[in-house]
Amino acid sequence: MDQHQITIFVVAVVAIVLAAALGFFVARKRRSQRLRERFGPEYDRVLQKEGEVSRAEGVLAMRATRREKFELRPLTAALRSDFSDRWSAVQAEFVDNPKGAVSGADQLVNEVMKARGYPVVDFDQRAADISVDHPVVVENYRAAHEIALRHSRGQASTEDLRRAMVHYRSLFQELLQDSIPVRELPHRREARA
């Protein structure tokens, strides 16, 4: 090989390495952007907890992979109606028995999750699983759970319990809304009219 061929070879190798590095960084940036869009505020929460982008994104990607294995299903109209009626009863109970209502709300949210096809294991895993499909309201779920734990230690006021009910309701409503087939959603009916 003469000097000219060596120079061409070196330039070609450097160009290939630079192109590969650029491709890697572009792919990584796209992955980060997709995860940030999918998980919203949950992305930032996990990043803060993990302290490193690659670890946080690995956690979120594992959650998404785990979630893809679930066979989520919509609720039937009868189940939606039953759950809605039971939620109304839990809310009404709050007036006379706030702690019982919060406990009932937690139990009812778990039942809806189970009926939809989410595995109902320990709280942290439930929150991680639900964060894939409901990244905004999962923080409400965590807040409600934290209030319930504080209440069990005698550290939550009635106002705290009221906030827990509001937080549980946000997830409850989203789980029920997700189970309505698209053709039944109000905005879809209006768009067709």
Mark where each language-model region is.
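Elongated extramembrane "stalk/tether" segments
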Residues: R30-N140, A144-A156
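A generic alpha-helix propensity feature with a strong bias for hydrophobic helices
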Residues: M1-Q3, A101, E184, R189
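Intrinsic disorder/low-complexity segments
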Residues: V13-I16, A20, M165
